[in-house]
């Protein structure tokens, strides 16, 4: 059954893109606004060009995703249905069913670890290709006027919609609501304020020679300081350069958050020396303030009706990682479909 009406979605990560995809399939006019230069949120991919012959491609946010059996069997089947669709379309592929650990032992995931076929961001780009998406759209204010939401961006643009979904990290959504003078029930707000995230400092290192990371190209660290190392060349997305992603653990990321990039790079390269043993041609440092959920809201999404139809969603609500973001976005879409 087709629905009339429109919906604005703030945030172009997986929660926002999945909500937008479902709502559009049900006939709503959907607009996605994202503050970044590219779509995907933590499905993030970046290129480092060293020369005409050498270019590294890095997945530097989420490294892969799985379909777990811990979130709820009905919802898992729903997510698996989407995964099957993406596999059939060739958008994603299985990377592995586990990775080696820093200790040298292999840790099985007991389930497929999926990745984007071209890159992890390519999944987000696939979803976005049929949607109306505005990037570089930093939203600064929300208002409910004449039975619709009006959203203003930092550049002065205005967007309107009958419904509104917020999918940024919870602290950012709360800040936006505060700046917009939109009040939330004190008990609900207190629960939202308890949602917390681990930070993650990530290094993108373009190496002169192949890494020593064991196949299939991922390695779990102890978290002190490295939590994860990935060889994007082995992963199959960086064919013209030996691109290595190094992700620090939460404690290191917190302690070194304000340190300069050179000091961070020195520490992470020292920790990874056994698996690199090669000259670094170029590198970048990226800081993920809201990398992974530490304490979640405990519900798939938050549905509010005042001052107008407003949904808060994202991985901070149901469960961490890509799966949690997807399931939250699907729940957000379902909650709005009865509002015809």
Over which residues does each language-model region extend?
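Short beta-strand to alpha-helix junction loop
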Residues: 67-68, 74, 100-126, 258-264
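Flavin (FAD/FMN) cofactor-binding core of flavoprotein oxidoreductases
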Residues: 266-308
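A conserved short coil-to-beta-strand element within the FAD-binding core of flavoproteins
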Residues: 135-150
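Central helical "cap/lid" subdomain
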Residues: 40, 53-55, 162-216, 278
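Core beta-strand elements of the Rossmann-like FAD/NAD(P) dinucleotide-binding domain
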Residues: 3-5, 154-163
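N-terminal FAD cofactor-binding segment of flavoenzymes
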Residues: 22, 44-96
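Active-site substrate-recognition segment that forms the wall
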Residues: 202-255, 267-275
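Glycine-rich FAD pyrophosphate-binding loop
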Residues: 8, 21-51
């Amino acid at each position: 059954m087709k629905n009339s009406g429109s919906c604005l979605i703030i945030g172009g990560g997986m929660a926002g893109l999945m909500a937008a995809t479902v709502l559009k399939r049900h006939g709503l006019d959907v607009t996605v606004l994202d503050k970044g230069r590219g779509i995907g949120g933590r499905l993030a991919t970046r290129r480092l060009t060293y020369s005409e012959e050498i270019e590294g491609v890095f997945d530097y946010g989420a490294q892969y995703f799985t379909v777990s059996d811990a979130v709820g069997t009905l919802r898992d089947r729903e997510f698996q249905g989407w995964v099957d669709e993406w596999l059939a379309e060739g958008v994603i592929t299985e990377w592995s069913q586990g990775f080696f650990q820093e200790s040298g032992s292999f840790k099985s995931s007991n389930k497929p670890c999926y990745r984007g076929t071209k890159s992890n961001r390519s999944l987000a780009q696939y979803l976005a290709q049929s949607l109306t998406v505005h990037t570089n759209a930093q939203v600064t204010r929300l208002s409910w006027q004449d039975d619709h939401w009006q959203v203003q961006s930092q550049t002065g643009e205005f967007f309107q919609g009958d419904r509104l979904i917020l999918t940024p990290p919870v602290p950012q959504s709360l800040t936006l609501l505060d700046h917009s003078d939109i009040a939330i029930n004190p008990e609900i707000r207190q629960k939202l304020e308890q949602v917390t995230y681990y930070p993650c400092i990530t290094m993108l290192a373009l190496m002169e020679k192949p890494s020593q990371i064991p196949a299939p190209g991922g390695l779990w660290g102890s978290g002190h300081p490295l939590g994860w190392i990935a060889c994007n060349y082995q992963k199959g997305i960086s064919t013209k350069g030996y691109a290595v992603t190094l992700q620090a653990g939460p404690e290191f990321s917190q302690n070194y958050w304000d340190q300069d990039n050179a000091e961070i790079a020195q520490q992470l390269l020292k920790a990874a020396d056994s698996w690199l043993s090669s000259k670094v041609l170029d590198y970048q440092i990226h800081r993920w303030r809201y990398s992974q959920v530490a304490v979640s809201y405990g519900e798939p999404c938050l549905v509010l009706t005042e001052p107008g139809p407003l949904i808060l969603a994202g991985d901070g609500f149901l469960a961490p990682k890509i799966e949690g973001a997807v399931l939250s976005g699907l729940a957000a879409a379902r909650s709005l479909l009865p509002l015809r």
